[in-house]
């Protein structure tokens, strides 16, 4: 038995073209027209359902009306040497009187009432002459970004060289110098006192007393070392600001 000819008009008729790059969703449109005087049910199928999203994928087209179907290709790693084997099929039939349950309508449809059209998928990459245009766009974006960043850098440099900040750092440096000098004098005084205690300790032969001065001296040395390190860091900061 001869197959019933498709009554719907398809635009495009034979190929669905998807233009890359394919790093994002690529959409192409399929227009279905119903030139008849009867309502027509349609359904869109594909051999690769996981790779495409079709909206709407089924429905009813009124007599003399048309509908646009969006076919969305999901992102994937494109290989130019690999030919696409994906295909789509538009299946249709004249709508019965009762269309309240479309699932049952399609399930009960007779093979001789079904009409179908097949389309193959074609993947295209941007033409070579489009690439310089993309390069120019990238240059414009880069230039704009550079101009945007320049005031930020200048503002940062201006803030670093603020006279008030430099004055505060210098005052802190002087304060640290005075603190270091004071600790040196205290350290000298402790050493003199420790020498006196050591002599008394030797005379009394007390091991506990001999350990006491050492703990004080170590505590003082630690404080002195910490201040020296802090003073060094402040000096480095001043040096960078001066440059």
Curated annotation (Swiss-Prot):
Modified-residue entries (N-acetylalanine), positions: 2
Biological source species: Homo sapiens
Originating gene: VAPB
Transmembrane segments: 223-243
Recorded coiled-coil stretches: 159-196
Residue(s) carrying Phosphoserine: 146, 156, 158-160, 206
Recorded consequence of changing residue 87 to D: Prevents binding to the FFAT motif in target proteins
Involvement in disorder: Amyotrophic lateral sclerosis 8: A neurodegenerative disorder affecting upper motor neurons in the brain and lower motor neurons in the brain stem and spinal cord, resulting in fatal paralysis. Sensory abnormalities are absent. The pathologic hallmarks of the disease include pallor of the corticospinal tract due to loss of motor neurons, presence of ubiquitin-positive inclusions within surviving motor neurons, and deposition of pathologic aggregates. The etiology of amyotrophic lateral sclerosis is likely to be multifactorial, involving both genetic and environmental factors.
Stored PROSITE patterns: MSP (PS50202)
GO molecular function annotations of the record: beta-tubulin binding; cadherin binding; enzyme binding; FFAT motif binding; microtubule binding; protein heterodimerization activity; protein homodimerization activity; protein-membrane adaptor activity
Protein name as annotated: Vesicle-associated membrane protein-associated protein B/C
Effect of residue 89 to D: Prevents binding to the FFAT motif in target proteins
Cell location: Endoplasmic reticulum membrane
Cross-link named Glycyl lysine isopeptide (Lys-Gly) (interchain with G-Cter in SUMO1), sites: 147
Membrane-topology annotation of the record: Single-pass type IV membrane protein
UniProt comment concerning the protein's domains: The MSP domain binds the FFAT motif of many proteins.
């Amino acid at each position: 038995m001869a197959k019933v000819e498709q009554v719907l008009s398809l635009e495009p008729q034979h190929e669905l073209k998807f233009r890359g790059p394919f790093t994002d969703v690529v959409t192409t449109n399929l227009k279905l027209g119903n030139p008849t005087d009867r309502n027509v049910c349609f359904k869109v199928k594909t051999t690769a359902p996981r790779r495409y999203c079709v909206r709407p994928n089924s429905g009813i087209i009124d007599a003399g009306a048309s509908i646009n179907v969006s076919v969305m290709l999901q992102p994937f790693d494109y290989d130019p040497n690999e030919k696409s084997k994906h295909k789509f099929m538009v299946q249709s039939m004249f709508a019965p009187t009762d269309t309240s349950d479309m699932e049952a309508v399609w399930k009960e449809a007779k093979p001789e009432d079904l009409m179908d059209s097949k389309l193959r998928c074609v993947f295209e990459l941007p033409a070579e002459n489009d690439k310089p245009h993309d390069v120019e766009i990238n240059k414009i974006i880069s230039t704009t970004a550079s101009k945007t960043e320049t005031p930020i850098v200048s503002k940062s440099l201006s803030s670093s060289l603020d006279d008030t900040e430099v004055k505060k750092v210098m005052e802190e440096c002087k304060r640290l110098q005075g603190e270091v000098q004071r600790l040196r004098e205290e350290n000298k005084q402790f050493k003199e006192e420790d020498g006196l205690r050591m002599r008394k300790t030797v005379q009394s032969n007390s091991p506990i007393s001999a350990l006491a001065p050492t703990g004080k001296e170590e505590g003082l040395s630690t404080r002195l070392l910490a201040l020296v390190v802090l003073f060094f860091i402040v000096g480095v900061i001043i040096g960078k600001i001066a440059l």
